[in-house]
């Protein structure tokens, strides 16, 4: 499974390839390692950052950067689905254009209105969005760190800035999700480092962190 972002400003793009089903820009794809062929799983993505495949529940969890705000957490279709989901970029976003408002760019805003709803315009809503942005990064999933019984427990990293730690930057977000894909609880664990990457090591029951600020490796583990 691979993510591909929108490699240029949507509103300034001549081709709008994010919206085209025959283009891989702004998509999440599944690659067959034997045949080298791929299929599109979802579209309408701006800048996917984190990706985790839950093989037990056959679900794809992903994160992506919004523009100025509007970072997203999405639960994607299973790789077996024949339905291509559309998350709406650049028609819908909970972020804003950089420099908005700017009267010189009114025509560009019309091309990419960044509507503050996905569902109303025929797209899928993120299960969580962040405004202001937390500079979202990797996502991992494990239910082994806590005795609380939830269907899904995810851990989401954030880059960002020291001045915005109180808003969730430079932290790990522990999010509890029920069977109906409703968020029931959200804990923020300040790390005071830009968290670039994370990986869950099942054999150790630990999450290994790549901390970009100091260029070091961190370990997140349960103390229960």
For each of these PLM feature ranges, what is it?
Residues 199-224:
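Blade-level signature of beta-propeller repeat domains, shared across WD40, Kelch, NHL, RCC1
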Residues 181-202:
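Conserved blade-ending motifs and adjacent loop-strand segments that build the rim/top face
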